């Protein structure tokens, strides 16, 4: 056998594992599952044994995770609201996002990161609110400590983010750890980046005690920031995501383009370029942009030129109720009238050969 053919056969097993698609986070479907914990644990498709075990042992945590799915999917949709792919979910699909995440793309990287972050956030918040039997406020934040402003006492309820991260890692990563392929490694990396993003915005809040509000004594606690901060941070990481390829031994990544830096644990990584999401494509999981609202005056991703992929747009005149003629009344209220406002709404045309024009 000649040398080129030898090289092909050496790389074939790695290539096959690299291209094997699998959307593994079927726990996302917990948002749509109701009933008792046993019903939920037994009916969410695709959970591995470790995940079902945790589900049965910690039904209260699973409820928190299920409620959190709606929160992080809403955040995903907010971040992608001006993007051709707008993080749309499919109600009857256990993968929640359909075939679009079969591709190891930037979008997949973001969804795995934001979902992992969402689990940390939901569990940690539930701990602080006393909703979980297995955790409460951070037990390590006790006694006296110092910061740049001086001495303070730990008090209140510090968010127990270490517990949230630990449980999220055990539950979310369980299925990926059973896999040895490149996609599993990619998902694990992005899951970790999502968890780290939540902790990045943990902030110290304090309350002053003393005469006339003087700060002779301070009580402080650690609190998570609003989840929007995590979402916006991961959105920036999405825009700077690093394309990688597998090492020859299949144990890690190297950058696809040697001009770029090696990804850190905070970066998002992906293997495959994204489709353009312009047209409906069942194989790619793209719903296209036909019927999407676009911004005629924008020069960004939401512009009619970019959003509609050069196909043009339709314009319709609509009316909406707005507040007008607002006046300040002493003291202390602003009173407005309800007025009808007419405005033009621009929506992307469908491809000429398309049979589907429903908005996405």
Curated annotation (Swiss-Prot):
The keyword Signal applies. Residues 1-25 form the signal peptide. It is found in: Secreted, Extracellular space, Extracellular matrix; Secreted. Gene3D superfamilies: 3.30.2460.20. One of its GO terms (cellular component) is cytoplasm. It comes from the Eukaryota. A lipid is attached at residue 212 (O-palmitoleoyl serine). Glycans are attached at residue 295. One of its GO terms (biological process) is positive regulation of fibroblast proliferation. GO terms for molecular function: cytokine activity; frizzled binding. Its main location: secreted. Disulfide bonds join 76-87, 127-135, 137-157, 206-220, 208-215, 278-309, 294-304, 308-348, 324-339, 326-336, 331-332. Palmitoleoylation is required for efficient binding to frizzled receptors. Depalmitoleoylation leads to Wnt signaling pathway inhibition. Keywords: Developmental protein, Disulfide bond, Extracellular matrix, Glycoprotein, Lipoprotein, Secreted, Signal, Wnt signaling pathway. The keyword ATP-binding does not apply. Belongs to the Wnt family. Ligand for members of the frizzled family of seven transmembrane receptors. Functions in the canonical Wnt signaling pathway that results in activation of transcription factors of the TCF/LEF family. Functions as a upstream regulator of FGF10 expression. Plays an important role in embryonic lung development. May contribute to embryonic brain development by regulating the proliferation of dopaminergic precursors and neurons. This is Protein Wnt-2.
């Amino acid at each position: 056998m000649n040398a080129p053919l030898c090289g092909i056969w050496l790389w074939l097993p790695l290539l096959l594992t690299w291209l094997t698609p699998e959307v593994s986070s079927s726990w996302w479907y917990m948002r749509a599952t109701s009933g008792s914990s046993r019903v939920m644990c037994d009916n969410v498709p695709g959970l591995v044994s470790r995940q079902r075990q945790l589900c049965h042992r910690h039904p209260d945590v699973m409820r928190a995770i299920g409620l959190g799915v709606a929160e992080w999917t809403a955040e995903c949709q907010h971040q992608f609201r001006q993007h051709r792919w707008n993080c749309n979910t499919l109600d009857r699909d256990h993968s929640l996002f359909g075939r679009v995440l079969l591709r190891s793309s930037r979008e997949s990287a973001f969804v795995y990161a934001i979902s992992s972050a969402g689990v940390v956030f939901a569990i940690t918040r539930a701990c602080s609110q006393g909703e979980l039997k297995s955790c409460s406020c951070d037990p390590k934040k006790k006694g006296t400590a110092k910061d740049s402003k001086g001495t303070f006492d730990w008090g209140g309820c510090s968010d127990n983010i270490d517990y949230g991260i630990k449980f999220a890692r055990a539950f979310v990563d369980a299925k990926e750890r059973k896999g040895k392929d490149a996609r599993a490694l990619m998902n694990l990396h992005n899951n970790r980046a999502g968890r780290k993003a939540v902790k990045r915005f943990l902030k110290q809040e304090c309350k002053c005690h003393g005469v006339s509000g003087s700060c002779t004594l301070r009580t402080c606690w650690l609190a998570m920031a609003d989840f929007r901060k995590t979402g916006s941070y991961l959105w920036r990481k999405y825009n700077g995501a690093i394309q990688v390829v597998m090492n020859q031994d299949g144990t890690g990544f190297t950058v696809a383009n040697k001009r770029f830096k090696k990804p850190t644990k905070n970066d998002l990584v992906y293997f495959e370029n994204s489709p353009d999401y312009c047209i409906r494509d069942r194989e790619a999981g793209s719903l296209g942009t036909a019927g999407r609202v676009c911004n005629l005056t924008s020069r960004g991703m939401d512009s009619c030129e970019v959003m509609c992929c050069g196909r043009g747009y339709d314009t319709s005149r609509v009316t909406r109720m707005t507040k007008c003629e607002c006046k300040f009344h002493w003291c202390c209220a602003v009173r407005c009238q309800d007025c009808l406002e007419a405005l033009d709404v621009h929506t992307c045309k469908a491809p000429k050969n398309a049979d589907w024009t429903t908005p996405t």
